[in-house]
Amino acid sequence: MLNIFSLICICLNSALYSSSLFFAKLPEAYAFLNPIVDLMPVIPLFFFLLAFVWQAAVSFR
């Protein structure tokens, strides 16, 4: 039971730490990549939605 609690605490701490990294600024040398970097977290959602569209297209044949 203690191990599960420890694992939950570790996961929460890493989630909080990673969310602070999410709002970090790029160095000035890479400032021109800001629009691409802002779009990058959304890209996996496009593949997720594409899977549903593909399944719908296949089932209607």
Swiss-Prot record:
The record's subunit annotation is:
PSII is composed of 1 copy each of membrane proteins PsbA, PsbB, PsbC, PsbD, PsbE, PsbF, PsbH, PsbI, PsbJ, PsbK, PsbL, PsbM, PsbT, PsbX, PsbY, PsbZ, Psb30/Ycf12, at least 3 peripheral proteins of the oxygen-evolving complex and a large number of cofactors. It forms dimeric complexes.
What NCBIfam families does the record tag this protein with? PRK02553.1
Protein topology in the membrane = Single-pass membrane protein
Q: Which UniProt keywords apply?
A: Chloroplast, Membrane, Photosynthesis, Photosystem II, Plastid, Reaction center, Thylakoid, Transmembrane, Transmembrane helix
**Which protein family is named in the record?**
Belongs to the PsbK family.
Q: What is this protein called?
A: Photosystem II reaction center protein K
Q: Which domain of life is it from?
A: Eukaryota
Cellular-component GO terms for this entry: chloroplast thylakoid membrane; photosystem II reaction center
- Pro-piece positions: 1-24
Q: Which GO terms describe its biological process?
A: photosynthesis
Membrane-crossing residue ranges in chain numbering: 40-60
What biological function has been recorded for the protein in this entry?
One of the components of the core complex of photosystem II (PSII). PSII is a light-driven water:plastoquinone oxidoreductase that uses light energy to abstract electrons from H(2)O, generating O(2) and a proton gradient subsequently used for ATP formation. It consists of a core antenna complex that captures photons, and an electron transfer chain that converts photonic excitation into a charge separation.
Q: Where in the cell is it found?
A: Plastid, Chloroplast thylakoid membrane
The cross-references to Pfam families, in alphabetical order and at most eight, read: PsbK
In which broad location class does this protein mainly occur, judging by the first location in its UniProt entry? plastid
